[in-house]
C-alpha cells in the first residue's frame, strides 16, 4: 500500500536510488496504490552521471509492495520492500535494466517491456 510521502527503492538503472511518492494516479480521491499502479514521485537520492537527477519529478510504476496483492486463485504475493521502476509517458522504462523480481500483474497494465527486462517474474 503506497501513499503520499512513501519512500520506494528504484529497481532499475536510471540513476535514481530512492524516490518519494507525491501522488497515486487514477482518480481524484485515490489515496493508496499497489503493484501495477502508476505514481508521480520525486527523486530523493541519485547516482552521479545517471539519467535522472535528484529533485526531478518522475512517473513510476510500482513493481514490489510489502503489503502484497491477492491473486484470482486466492493466493497472496508479498515482497520485502517497496520498489518502483521509473517510466516515460508511453509506459516504457527509462532505464535499460531491471533489478530483482517483479509481479506478474504488470502484464494486465501493459508493462510488457518491464516484464521482459526483469530477471524473475513471480
From Swiss-Prot:
Keywords: Ribonucleoprotein, Ribosomal protein, RNA-binding, rRNA-binding. PROSITE patterns: RIBOSOMAL_L14. Transmembrane segments: none annotated. One of its GO terms (molecular function) is structural constituent of ribosome. GO terms for biological process: translation. One of its GO terms (cellular component) is cytosolic large ribosomal subunit. The keyword Ribosomal protein applies. The keyword RNA-binding applies. Part of the 50S ribosomal subunit. Forms a cluster with proteins L3 and L19. In the 70S ribosome, L14 and L19 interact and together make contacts with the 16S rRNA in bridges B5 and B8. PANTHER family: 50S/60S RIBOSOMAL PROTEIN L14/L23 (PTHR11761), LARGE RIBOSOMAL SUBUNIT PROTEIN UL14M (PTHR11761:SF3). Belongs to the universal ribosomal protein uL14 family. Binds to 23S rRNA. Forms part of two intersubunit bridges in the 70S ribosome. This is Large ribosomal subunit protein uL14. It comes from Clostridium perfringens (strain 13 / Type A). The lineage of its organism: Bacteria, Bacillati, Bacillota, Clostridia, Eubacteriales. The gene is rplN.
Amino acid at each position: 500500500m503506497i501513499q503520499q510521502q512513501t519512500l520506494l527503492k528504484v529497481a532499475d538503472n536510471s540513476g535514481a536510488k530512492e524516490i518519494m511518492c507525491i501522488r497515486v494516479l487514477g482518480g481524484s480521491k485515490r489515496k493508496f496504490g499497489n503493484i501495477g499502479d502508476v505514481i508521480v514521485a520525486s527523486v530523493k537520492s541519485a547516482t552521479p552521471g545517471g539519467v535522472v537527477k535528484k529533485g526531478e519529478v518522475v512517473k513510476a510504476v510500482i513493481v514490489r509492495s510489502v503489503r502484497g496483492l491477492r491473486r484470482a486463485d486466492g493466493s497472496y504475493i508479498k515482497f520485502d520492500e517497496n520498489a518502483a521502476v521509473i517510466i516515460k509517458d508511453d509506459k516504457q522504462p527509462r532505464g535499460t535494466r531491471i533489478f530483482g523480481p517483479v509481479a506478474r500483474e504488470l502484464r494486465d497494465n501493459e508493462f510488457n517491456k518491464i516484464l521482459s527486462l526483469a530477471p524473475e517474474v513471480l
